[in-house]
């Protein structure tokens, strides 16, 4: 970003990072920062009972990392407290090789409440770039389980885009395309372009935004991706053309 952009948003970035730092709780006994009391993106989890939801943990790490880079670009030293959080933020909780909906959701794969709504765990390495909290092998296992077993009848329009972005980053391009083309009611787009959810909700802009973002990412790539159109299968069946897009982080 230009110096003008750095100066314009420096106070907003710093204040956001300070809030995020203050919101987390430091567990003295285990020597780690934990997140609790937040309303998770997967709305079937209750904020009062939820500790360390995976998407939010990854978002904390990403946002604090961006705030540190902002300081460096301004010629400032890194904030030592923020660095401590980056080093000691809780990793994503997993069980039997699968990421949990939250550290406290130990019945993630037994209770349909945890396998309905947004599969936000995939957003931890889909919407967001890879961070040290995420292991790709466990995320691939989780994607495969979600693909085969999720309660897809209880999803929302942007869930398909989130799944596609996770699959693309993992190199599972067949699932990336398959997610965007999945034949589910909430993945319906009407002739006027609106993402139909049900008779009550015929306009759902998060679905449109998710579709546009995921396709752009699959075309232009992301930091560390290789080759052209990295989110599409290289089986000779795709002729992808685009212009004016920038890679995702």
Predicted regions and their residues:
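Active-site core of glycosidic bond-cleaving carbohydrate-active enzymes
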Residues: 1-11, 53-223
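Short, glycine/acidic-rich hinge or "gate" loops at secondary-structure transitions
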Residues: 8, 25-35, 76-82, 228
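Acidic/histidine-rich catalytic neighborhood
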Residues: 15-73
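A general structural signal for short secondary-structure junctions and capping/turn motifs
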Residues: 25-26, 49, 114-116, 245-248
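Surface beta-strand/loop "capping" patches
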Residues: 229-249
